[in-house]
């Protein structure tokens, strides 16, 4: 294995921050003019990707969508009149029983009567590690430059939808609505218009629906966006076939028309690659520090010195600015803030140490010991490119809330392409133990007890169905619920990927 030293890639980061600073979640126009297959061949030639016959076939099928986009002229979408949208969500109910005007945005539609004026998008589904996200990201870079585009993780998109809905209500001047003053405004038409104008091509990563509120607003929003009037082209990745979205959900029958519309507006492709790309050996960098020598205790002076050195090196590396100051003989300049105020959903959140927007540093207790939610972690991931998390203790099912928060944080950082460096009691595959094994946060009790037997059937299922390694699948068995087991196993898989040289040195989106 090759250990990546911070100084070894310092020059790359300086060049990277000078020349490549694109926010992943804002609409942008592509500067590329290559087809998806040409871009794939280019990356293979550079050694960035392995040539895979199966994936090459999938990419070839994306050529039809690319050709359609080259010739596509999206419709002009006008911002709706606030007066016409008074009545809020009740308008959606009225539309089910009435054919009258004004036309309701996002009402039920008969897919058999929909035209073909919009290019048919792609819905790519398959197991973890089969390359779905890579294929979508590759296609995203080749979208013709006359079209706007947005690439976003689905959870973050729904966070945006809910937050933007509240903002739209505040922005509308109800004083000018006459008799409608004080009444609720239907925000879906405003959202649909904004998204359609900023995202002619909308790319969702990890499309999934688990919440009834999300399902109902998504039904109306997608019905509008995928209509001829709005003309948005959808590219989505998911672990599930469209027919399995929101399965067993509350009021699912109301969501089925949305599923049918997605199937009509996209080409559904099952990605069943024989290669799990997360299992391909990569050089591991030294971003995660733990006492590799069992004779050295975490609280010892020697270990403390090593931890502090590790943190300092990686903080300075992540914090490199995108410019230099001539007065300092071209040394990198950056400023460190303590208790830095960050506004999250209208409240102030203090980051213990950071160099915005490069890096933020927390102890594990500060990050996961407090009652933070997904929205908090998504905001952090949006505002910082890298994170350092120190003093990660041994964890067990007795601190399930902290484990869940850490997994939620990790998902947010991973989905934004962020970097991570840590210090902890042990390597991540050994951090999660049985409660009786823990002596204190950073020490285990001496034991000669044989490990508990695991359900080999469940282990085999996770290996075969989801593509996890057998070691990761075994570790996940300490959790009782299937959802927890899957989330834990995915977290270990992602942590391994995030420790690779490729991940640490890739441009931050």
UniProtKB/Swiss-Prot annotation:
UniProt-annotated binding residues for ATP: 126-133
GO biological process, one term: protein quality control for misfolded or incompletely synthesized proteins
Cellular component aspect of the GO annotation: cytoplasm; mitochondrial inner membrane; mitochondrion
GO molecular function per UniProt: ATP binding; ATP hydrolysis activity
Keywords: ATP-binding, Nucleotide-binding
Other remarks on this protein: Present with 3570 molecules/cell in log phase SD medium.
NCBIfam families: ZapE
PANTHER family documented for this protein: AFG1-LIKE ATPASE (PTHR12169:SF6), ATPASE N2B (PTHR12169)
Family of the protein in this entry: Belongs to the AFG1 ATPase family.
Name of the protein this chain belongs to: Protein AFG1
Species of origin: Saccharomyces cerevisiae (strain ATCC 204508 / S288c)
